[in-house]
Design a protein with these regions (language model features):
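Short, well-ordered alpha-helical segments
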Residues: 50, 94-102, 168, 172, ...
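Extended mid-to-C-terminal alpha-helical interaction segments
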Residues: 133-211
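Short hinge/gating elements
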Residues: 37-43, 86-90, 160, 179
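Solvent-exposed amphipathic alpha-helical surface segments
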Residues: 21, 63, 111, 115, ...
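DNA-contacting interfaces and partner/effector-binding or oligomerization modules
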Residues: 68-159
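Residue-level recognition of alpha-helical structural elements
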Residues: 3, 45, 89-93, 189, ...
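N-terminal low-complexity or simple alpha-helical regulatory segments
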Residues: 1-82
């Protein structure tokens, strides 16, 4: 969409204006579960991490249109979350890739807990020589540059973990949603109701029978 294209351009322009090649990485390191709003809350209520990732794979476009997650087993003991649509015919969106990888890493850390650690992160971008160590430090794992894809790899054992349900995070998510609605109050309140119903109907937690 044009809005997505505009946002991605802004992200790249901000990095250039600040002369900060790690803009997306640093921005991503400041994100948390609350960043993905209702999707994060729904992920934390799933029975396993696999189910939570399936939620992300299915609904992430509601939060970040144009981003698609592909979840797949990689070998016998590894899992891959691949980020697609981070580029178009004209350019690579380097900062968006940094932000997406970092955000998923942060969300997984919150869902899994202290045991979380990615095995490797792959980025299609070229390495930024003086900042290479920062990538490994922020992501907490080996980072491979000039890769064929933007992806994060981790032990498939994590897929069976039960997501940590943090009531404080859920309270924050709800409060943030309410505050956003207060600040950005739309003239047509039905838009909010329609949006919420679409989200609930999509997840299956709401049906015409129980509304």
């Amino acid at each position: 969409s044009s809005d997505l294209s505009h946002y991605l351009q802004l992200l790249e322009l901000a990095a250039a204006a600040c002369d900060e090649p790690c803009f997306g990485l640093k921005l991503g390191s400041q994100q948390s579960m609350s960043t993905v709003g209702l999707i994060g809350a729904y992920m934390s209520r799933q029975p396993t991490i696999l189910d939570a990732l399936n939620v992300a794979q299915k609904y992430i476009y509601l939060h970040a249109e144009g981003i698609v997650l592909n979840l797949a087993l990689y070998g016998q003991n590894s899992c891959e979350v691949r980020f697609v649509r981070l580029s178009d015919e004209k350019q690579e969106f380097v900062q968006k890739a940094q932000l997406a990888v970092c955000l998923v890493n942060k969300v997984m850390k919150e869902l899994v807990g202290p045991k979380w650690r990615a095995d490797k992160v792959c980025l299609r971008q070229s390495p930024v020589s003086e900042h290479t160590a920062l990538f490994a430090k922020v992501l907490g794992c080996e980072v491979e540059f000039n890769a064929d894809t933007d992806a994060i790899y981790f032990s498939s054992a994590f897929l069976t973990y039960k997501p940590k349900l943090n009531d404080a995070i859920l309270d924050t998510l709800i409060a943030d949603q309410l505050e956003m609605q207060r600040i950005n109050k739309l003239p047509d309140e039905m838009l909010h109701i329609e949006s919420a119903m679409k989200m609930l109907l999509a997840t299956g937690d709401c049906s015409k029978e129980n509304t």
